[in-house]
Amino acid sequence: MSIAGDRTVAPWLDDSQFPFVSKFANVDGGRMHYVDDGQGEPVIFVHGFPTWSFMWRGLIRDLSTKHRCIAMDHIGFGLSDKPARWSYTPEAHARNFKKLLDHIGLSTFSLVVHDFGGPIALSYAIDNPGRINRICVVNSFLWSLKNDTSFQKFDHRMHGPMGKLALTATNTGLSHLVHGMVEQKQKVAGKVYPQYTGPFSKASDRHGAHVLAQGYIGSSTWLYDLWVRRESLAQKPLQVLWGMKDKLFSADHLNKWRAAWPNADVVTFPESGSLVMEEQAKEVEAAMYMFLDGHSELQSTTKALHAEF
């Protein structure tokens, strides 16, 4: 165990922004970093591409007054190990997610997922529905994207030489991706962005992100199977928080969640991109807080409030 912000471990890390104690679990590929803060009903936050547990810092700070907040970094991301030779597919990350849960030893918990964190974490939930209390989905998915035009174009870039060069040769490509995930640039302080790209300072550190980016289409068979088996989660309380100006996950993807979970609590943010927790921090925290506490009678008010933003 070490303190997050130790400059000998991650000299780029600003511990004033990420002031949490770091913990580690041994999983396939090396040491997986996670934070475990607060007491109460457990909530596990699962990031996707190309982010890490830093994205949840505000929610951890605010929700940990009533919840045990756990946020992990996939192998190859954040403060976790980044081995040169490892699979880095979403299926491999999903297996490691199970290893982390075995390490922590929770009986039941709620999930908050973003981007690829959806299928990575919900694959476990589908197989273990009795351990899941609630699910909050933030601009994420749980199905094959092989027929999705936007993701086909993205996948073509990621498999092409220029896409690989842009993502792995320097940190500039990932920096552009992160900036593109934010629509309302004025709402995110400049000091935040280097914390997202810091884990990828070396070329060798960016390999895992590149492989995962190829999984949107490359893991279509696995993703298709997850969607087919989603019925085990049909009765779970589900909240969907959606930045409507996401460059990849559109209103069509949001509507797929709505159709599959007609009773879901859906809160949209018309002017926000994928990193809605950065752009609408207070509003996201308020909506998630009420949902995790089961205050469904307040959720319609929350939706009306958010319609103003």
Name each model-derived stretch.
Residues 107-149:
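Conserved hydrolase catalytic core segment
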Residues 55-57, 80-86, 146-148, 251-252:
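Conserved catalytic-core motifs of eukaryotic protein kinase domains, centered on the activation segment
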Residues 27-29, 35-37, 71-114, 286:
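Active-site loop/oxyanion-hole signature of alpha/beta-hydrolase fold enzymes
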Residues 1-43, 64-67, 102, 106-108, ...:
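Alpha/beta-hydrolase fold catalytic core
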Residues 272-285:
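Catalytic histidine-centered segment of alpha/beta-hydrolase-like enzymes
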Residues 204-259, 268:
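Conserved serine/cysteine hydrolase catalytic core
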Residues 36-79:
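Conserved HGGG/HGGXW glycine-rich cap/lid loop of the alpha/beta-hydrolase fold
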Residues 146-211:
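Helix-rich cap/lid subdomain of alpha/beta-hydrolase
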